[in-house]
Structures are given as C-alpha cells and as structure tokens.
C-alpha cells in the first residue's frame, strides 16, 4: 500500500498532527480496514519514496487532506505540511486541475484560498483565520523588518502597506524571563521604525 493522508503528512515531516489518528493506506485493489489502520481504494495517485516508504507526494497529500478534512482542520494541516516541505499552493492547484471529478474536490478551492505555509504553528493559523473572518484582508506571514541594512525582527504576520504587525505570543513569552527580555527590546524598537504591533496571547 501507499501511505496517504495524515500518514503521508507525517513522513513528509509535518508537525502538530494528531498522534492518535489512524494510519492511512491506499491501494489500487480493495482491502478492508482494520483497527488503527484506515485503508482506502485509490487507483491513481502521485507518489514518491521517503526513507524507503512509498507515500503520496506533498501536493497529493495536501490535495487529499483539503478535500476530506473539515475546513479549519484542513487549513491547519495543509499549512503545517507546506511549512515542513516548502510546498506551494500553486502546486496543489495544479494537481487539483489534473484531478477533476475527484470526490470532495469542491472543498479544495476554499481551503487553498486560506492556506499559508508561513504559519509556524497552529495558533498562528487560527489567528490568521480570526483576522480574515473579522473582515480584514488576508495578512502576509513571516514579515522581515530591517533598519536600513540591519535585520531587526521577523513578525508572524501583518500588512506592510499599513505597517501593522500581528504577533502570536505563546505561553513561553510570558513565563520565560529571557524571552520576555527579548520581547521588551523587540517591541520597543518596532514602533520607533513606524510599525504598530498587535500582540495576541495564548
């Protein structure tokens, strides 16, 4: 069989997957699923070999997740897959074009309009979705800030045209003294360079 779905995502290095999710295999013939292993029939797949295991390609994996998972879970998982592999949304769109008629394909465009591999964690994905659903334009992710030629910071997301940054602060930003010190320095400099910083807490 071929590793697919979350199993393929895992072998491609995707983080933050559900450790209790059933393993997923696809085969050209029909085989019954067994406890802990979900087996599906899929005669045409784009595959590759990862560490000696045959798996669906990153693009095929993302396409399959986008058409089978609930919307927010699909966005979060495809974000993480793109972050881990460097996969681009256009590559998934190209595969979708080649896969017309596939079951669930109608869900794929909605997922891909909101996917961004720049998200470095699920909370960053959730923050981005909250901003968009509040009526704001889709933010750019991983914005690099310079003072002349000197690198100052990389922000989680924001809008360059308005010089507004949004930072998701996990628990460590409040509990780690060294991290707090870095944050104080960072957030003192950015306004001096003309940036407004909005901090979202865990």
Regions found by a protein language model. Name each.
Residues 1-105, 140:
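Short gly/ser-rich loop at a beta-strand->alpha-helix junction or flexible surface loop bordering the NTP-binding
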Residues 3, 82-202:
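Surface segments flanking catalytic/ligand-binding clefts of nucleic-acid enzymes
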């Amino acid at each position: 069989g071929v590793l697919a779905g979350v199993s393929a995502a895992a072998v491609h290095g995707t983080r933050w997957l559900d450790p209790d999710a059933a393993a997923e295999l696809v085969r050209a013939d029909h085989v019954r699923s067994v406890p802990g292993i979900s087996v599906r029939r899929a005669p045409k797949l784009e595959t590759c070999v990862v560490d000696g295991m045959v798996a669906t390609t990153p693009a095929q994996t993302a396409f399959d997740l986008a058409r089978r998972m609930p919307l927010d879970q699909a966005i979060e998982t495809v974000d993480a897959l793109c972050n881990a592999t460097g996969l681009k949304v256009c590559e998934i769109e190209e595969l979708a074009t080649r896969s017309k008629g596939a079951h669930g394909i109608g869900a794929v465009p909605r997922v891909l309009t909101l996917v961004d591999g720049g998200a470095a964690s699920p909370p960053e994905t959730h923050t981005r979705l909250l901003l968009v659903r509040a009526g704001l334009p889709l933010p750019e992710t991983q914005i690099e800030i310079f003072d002349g030629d000197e690198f100052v910071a990389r922000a989680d997301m924001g809008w360059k045209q308005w010089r507004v940054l949004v930072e998701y602060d996990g628990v460590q930003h409040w509990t780690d003294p060294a991290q707090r010190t870095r944050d104080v320095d960072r957030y003192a400099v950015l306004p001096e360079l003309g940036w407004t910083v909005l901090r979202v807490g865990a």
